[in-house]
Amino acid sequence: MKFISTFLTFILAAVSVTASSDEDIAQVPAEAIIGYLDFGGDHDIAFLPFSNATASGLLFINTTIAEAAEKEQNTTLAKREAVADAWHWLNLRPGQPMYKREANADAWHWLQLKPGQPMY
């Protein structure tokens, strides 16, 4: 994001600021205007020309979000130790369910299948 800020500062500094007269203002017919976007007091907006194989235009960027995303990309990742139970054989006892049940599940019971009833 620093490159974009530096680039925009350089470009905007190169533009000379002169008082414009009526002769300097481009005369654009009202039918040719597509739209107007007022930035108001927003100072965290940057725009860049964008072009690829299928489209071209202006890309509007929220610099605050872009800087936060860049900081997240630059953080280093560290490995952490996996905490796992020691390996052991699976012990099945008569009447014991194979898997843990949900916290709010019904109590364990034998599966009862009736004719025409779906399994689940």
Swiss-Prot record:
Record propeptide residues: 22-86, 102-107
GO CC terms: extracellular region; fungal-type vacuole
InterPro entries assigned: Mating_factor_a (IPR016326), Mating_factor_alpha_C (IPR006742), Mating_factor_alpha_N (IPR008675)
GO biological process, one term: mating
Pfam families in the record: MF_alpha, MF_alpha_N
Domain of life per record: Eukaryota
Signal peptide limits: 1-21
Function as written in the Swiss-Prot or TrEMBL entry: The active factor is excreted into the culture medium by haploid cells of the alpha mating type and acts on cells of the opposite mating type (type A). It mediates the conjugation process between the two types by inhibiting the initiation of DNA synthesis in type a cells and synchronizing them with type alpha.
The protein's name: Mating factor alpha-2
Gene encoding the protein: MF(ALPHA)2
